[in-house]
């Protein structure tokens, strides 16, 4: 491993610890597109994620400071999720991933 790679390994591992896994980037992508979403809207946007996994991923993203969770009413409880400033700072990375996928022949919508 060359010294440039070695010097970037820790920041790379840290970033992966925040956004790694099957669903976190997709959640960040959806929130970046829609600005604010309720739990049910996120679930409909990602029909193959289980409720347990979506709840766990949202909690992790909130704990890591990448999303905000806001209670908009108490009876019945209504919660909205949005990107934090820290989460929005990842959006250029997400956009570049989309561009890369299109350039590699991925599906266009």
From Swiss-Prot:
What are the recorded GO MF terms, alphabetically? DNA binding
What InterPro entries does the annotation carry? HTH_HxlR, WH-like_DNA-bd_sf, WH_DNA-bd_sf
Pfam families recorded: HxlR
The entry's keywords: DNA-binding, Transcription, Transcription regulation
**Keyword Transcription tagged:** yes
Q: Which residues belong to any copy of the HTH hxlR-type domain?
A: 10-109
SUPFAM superfamilies per record? Winged helix' DNA-binding domain (SSF46785)
Domain of life where this protein originates? Bacteria
Its protein name is: Uncharacterized HTH-type transcriptional regulator YdzF
Organism equals Bacillus subtilis (strain 168)
């Amino acid at each position: 491993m060359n010294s440039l790679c070695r010097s970037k390994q820790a920041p790379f591992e840290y970033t992966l610890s925040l956004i790694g896994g099957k669903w976190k980037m997709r959640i960040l992508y959806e929130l970046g597109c829609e600005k604010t979403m309720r739990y049910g809207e996120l679930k409909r946007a990602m029909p193959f994620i289980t409720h347990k996994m979506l709840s766990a991923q949202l909690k992790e993203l909130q704990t890591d400071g990448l999303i905000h969770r806001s209670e908009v009413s108490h009876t019945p409880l209504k919660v909205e999720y949005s990107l934090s400033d820290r989460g929005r700072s990842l959006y250029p990375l997400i956009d570049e991933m989309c561009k890369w996928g299109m350039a590699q022949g991925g599906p266009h919508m």
